[in-house]
Regions:
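NAD(P)H-binding glycine-rich loop region in Rossmannoid oxidoreductase-like domains
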Residues: 88-99, 115, 122, 131-174, ...
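Conserved glycine-rich Rossmann-like NAD(P)H-binding loop of the short-chain dehydrogenase/reductase
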Residues: 95-109
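Short, low-complexity, charge-dense intrinsically disordered segments
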Residues: 7-13
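Strand-loop microenvironment adjacent to phosphate/nucleotide-handling motifs in alpha/beta enzyme folds
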Residues: 62, 221-434
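N-terminal Rossmann NAD(P)H-binding glycine-rich loop of SDR-like oxidoreductase domains
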Residues: 75-78, 83-89
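Conserved Rossmann-fold NAD(P)-dependent oxidoreductase catalytic core, especially the SDR/UDP-sugar
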Residues: 153, 157-174, 178-215, 223
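Non-catalytic terminal and boundary segments that flank Rossmann-like NAD(P)-dependent oxidoreductase
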Residues: 21-71, 419-433
Length: 434
């Protein structure tokens, strides 16, 4: 019998929590008791077990059939979602696992994590490589390996802050779309049995360039759905994932810096474990061309400020509100190590690209909510002709070759391709805030 829990050994203290304890500033001595996973269950998702566990258990035979003794490639596997996907897949005993990521340190930690987890199955052929999947060395690896049965791509720009100027916008679209096409073209040489590429809820009625890039990515992979099976998933924020606002609170505590959060931005949340499971279910059980999403109710959305309130209490503090960043920084720099108050700055969102709410599907998309207990599916997705998508990508690359192109030019090009894209430029980005 597959042990779904053996793949996840819960450290009582997160790696970042250890860093805080070892720092000169140890908040009240309470942090060494922090269990991040339990905090997520109690205060973020409100679920004591994964919402996807019933569907995994109900489909164990099928999942085993699709994964056991197969060759698996995970691109961007050192990140939060990619590593969680790996932990979800390994109990089904693939014959080979190759992980690609640009983060050498991340791959080292992934390997240590897997090999330090009690009960974790690791195939004899397990390899990690620090390289770009758009490089020629990756193409050589792919061909000499004889391709892969399962390919999952988690390499992406995921932050709304990635649209601050023309350079960041070009990098975002190069990575999320143009390089993704290069990968898809390579896969046509030795087609996989399953191809999965992660999307985002922000692809539904996008209001920022990151979300728009993911919507284009969806159109792109669907254009290949007649060449090999492709699926994707739009899902919620991953609680305390790398680079997320909640994860940054741990860093701020370690450096004795204020905590910040928007009061008017509501988000759905899944745990890191759940993020990998939804991707595995979509990848292995989906029909080509389908888009998956978690069946979460509107009432389950939470504001970051409410989560921050609970986090501060869990750390043994009382929050002290400040109206300005400067006031909060000053208080933080002067507060004693045994302070029972901790500075926070809560404010309404005022930066470009922030969407006040989340949605997984839009009007006109055909939804199936019966097939799985925890997952909804957008089926019969309208597939844009390959030539149409390819033409748009060529137009983007031509635009990027112009020395005088602007961010506004890119927005207009995206609006032409995505009529539902409603971008509002506010002249302020997240890099200008704490």
């Amino acid at each position: 019998m597959i042990n779904f829990h053996a793949k996840r050994a819960e450290n009582k203290v997160s790696r970042k929590a250890h860093a805080i304890i070892n720092n000169n500033f140890c908040p009240l001595g309470h942090l060494n008791m922090l269990n991040i996973q339990q905090f997520i269950r109690d205060h973020v998702t409100g679920r004591q077990q994964s919402m996807f566990l019933p569907d995994i258990q109900a489909n164990t035979t099928k999942l085993t059939q699709e994964i056991k003794n197969k060759k698996v490639l995970v691109i961007g596997g050192a990140g939060s979602i990619g590593s969680s996907y790996i932990k979800a897949v390994l109990p089904f005993r693939p014959a080979q696992l190759i992980v690609i990521d640009l983060s050498e340190n991340g791959l080292a930690e992934l390997t240590r994590d897997l090999r330090s987890t009690e009960g974790m199955y690791i195939p004899a052929d397990f390899r990690t490589y620090t390289l770009n999947f758009a490089d020629s060395i990756f193409e050589r690896l792919f061909r000499e390996n004889g391709g892969f049965d399962i390919v999952a791509n988690f390499s992406a720009h995921k932050h709304v802050r990635s649209e601050k100027d023309k350079y960041s916008v070009q990098a975002l679209l190069e990575n999320n779309v143009i390089k993704a096409k290069r990968l898809l073209d390579l896969l046509t040489e030795i087609p996989p049995q399953h191809f999965f590429c992660v999307s985002t809820d922000k692809a539904a009625n996008p209001v920022n360039i990151m979300g728009a890039s993911k919507r284009v990515m969806e159109d792109l992979i669907m254009a290949y759905s007649d060449r090999f099976p492709v699926t994707t998933a739009r899902f919620a924020n991953v609680a305390f994932s790398n680079g997320s606002l909640p994860a940054s609170w741990l860093d701020r505590l370690s450096k004795k810096q204020p905590l910040v959060a928007p009061t008017d931005v509501k988000r759905y949340f899944v745990s890191p474990e759940e993020s990998g499971q939804i991707c595995m279910l979509a990848c292995m059980l989906g029909k080509s061309g389908e888009i998956f999403f978690p069946k979460l109710k509107e009432g389950q959305m939470k504001t970051f400020s409410s989560i921050c309130d609970d986090f501060i209490m869990a750390m043994g503090y009382e929050k002290k509100n400040f109206d300005t960043d400067a006031e909060a920084r000053r208080f933080a720099s002067e507060m004693p190590a045994d302070s029972k108050l901790y500075p926070v700055v809560y404010s309404k969102s005022d930066t470009t690209g922030e969407k006040s709410y989340e949605e997984f599907f839009v009007e006109g998309e055909k939804i199936d909510i019966q097939r799985f207990t925890s997952l909804g599916i957008i089926e019969e997705v309208k597939i844009r002709p390959y030539a149409e998508v390819d033409k748009f990508l060529e137009e983007l690359q031509t635009l990027f070759c112009r020395a005088d192109f602007t961010k506004a030019d890119v927005v207009e090009a995206l609006k032409h391709f995505l009529p539902t894209f409603e971008h509002e430029e506010k002249g302020k980005n997240l890099d200008q805030k704490m």
